[in-house]
């Protein structure tokens, strides 16, 4: 992996700003955001990154990768898994925690909530159960009713996003 000098400078600036702004909380464990356990993990470099994608639940639609503003999600090929008669999953998302800014666009866009595995407006990181069993084939076989108005709104939003992606 080749890192350009500008990217390295930008990363260093963000890193140093973060340390400076959070120094008291990191060292003394003060404030409500950093517990003693988290402080020790930060200082020793042993912070565990939580599992963000439930691979068994994912349908491999690539929506999360397409919507990610930092391109932190890469679709990794897997052995094909038949989900329905007409659909086979052949890749799953892998999130790069160094690029991810936890904007949760992927979570909001995922049709089965396999990214961060939470259906809620609160930040899902480290919240709730680690694993929920769901039969994906039943989810995809259920008929979805969408009004004409909703279809028009969705197609309008998609066309705006496609234009933005093409410009990038």
Swiss-Prot record:
UniProt-annotated binding residues for [4Fe-4S] cluster: 58, 61, 64, 68, 100, 103, 106, 110
Pfam families documented for this protein: Fer4_7 (PF12838)
Intrachain S-S bonds: none
GO terms assigned for molecular function: 4 iron, 4 sulfur cluster binding; metal ion binding; oxidoreductase activity
Tagged with keyword Iron: yes
Keywords: 4Fe-4S, Electron transport, Iron, Iron-sulfur, Metal-binding, Repeat, Transport
Stretches assigned to the 4Fe-4S ferredoxin-type domain: 48-78, 91-122
Gene3D superfamilies (UniProt xref): 3.30.70.3270
Record has Metal-binding as a keyword: yes
Domain of life of the organism encoding this protein: Archaea
InterPro entries per UniProt: 4Fe4S_Fe-S-bd, 4Fe4S_Fe_S_CS, Fe-S_Ferredoxin
Name recorded for this polypeptide: Uncharacterized polyferredoxin-like protein MJ1302
Species per Swiss-Prot/TrEMBL record: Methanocaldococcus jannaschii (strain ATCC 43067 / DSM 2661 / JAL-1 / JCM 10045 / NBRC 100440)
